[in-house]
């Protein structure tokens, strides 16, 4: 069973579905609970989409032994980026007194108004809205759940990279 799951394109396609499924879940929660995503939330979604696109490219390419390792490295880099963003978001939520108390500018405004380097700096500093905890599942916040998902997808990518092709 596991061999078939990880064989060739199936494993990569599963990673693609999981990545974009998580983005879909985030959009569903946003609509259902009228949540306004902060810049770090949007950055995490972008990281999930990047990871998903890499999984889709690998599924379409169906790489050999060396290619699986290259894709594995790219997947791990994308997952590590997501882990870093989620970890920063968790820190901001745990230390709301260390960030701005008021809500800052939205993601779109920041990206349209500032040069890329300055925009990224502002996004990763976090804003007051990044410290808000609007929804939890089993006592875990959305960034904590995202961190778990990024770690899981990163480990899954490593497993795919070293799995023998059927």
From Swiss-Prot:
Subcellular localization(s) per the UniProt record: Cell inner membrane
Predominant cellular place of this UniProt entry's protein: membrane
Keywords: Cell inner membrane, Cell membrane, Chaperone, Disulfide bond, Electron transport, Membrane, Oxidoreductase, Redox-active center, Transmembrane, Transmembrane helix, Transport
Disulfide bond sites: 38-41, 103-130
Transmembrane stretches, start-end: 12-28, 47-63, 70-87, 145-163
Single annotated GO MF: electron transfer activity
Family of the protein in this entry: Belongs to the DsbB family.
Name of the protein in question: Disulfide bond formation protein B
């Amino acid at each position: 069973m596991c061999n078939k799951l990880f064989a060739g394109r199936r494993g990569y396609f599963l990673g693609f579905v999981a990545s974009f499924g998580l983005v879909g879940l985030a959009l569903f929660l946003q609509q259902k609970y009228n949540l306004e995503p902060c810049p770090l939330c949007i950055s995490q979604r972008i990281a999930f989409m990047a990871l998903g696109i890499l999984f889709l490219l690998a599924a379409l390419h169906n790489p050999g032994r060396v290619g699986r390792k290259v894709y594995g490295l790219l997947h791990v880099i994308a997952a590590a980026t997501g882990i870093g963003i989620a970890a920063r978001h968790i820190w901001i939520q745990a230390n709301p007194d260390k960030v701005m108390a008021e809500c800052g500018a939205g993601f779109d405004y920041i990206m349209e108004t500032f040069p890329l380097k300055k925009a990224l700096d502002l996004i990763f500093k976090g804003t007051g809205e990044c410290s808000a905890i609007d929804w939890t599942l089993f006592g875990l916040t959305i960034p904590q759940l995202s961190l778990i998902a990024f770690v899981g997808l990163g480990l899954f990518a490593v497993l795919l990279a070293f799995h023998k092709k059927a």
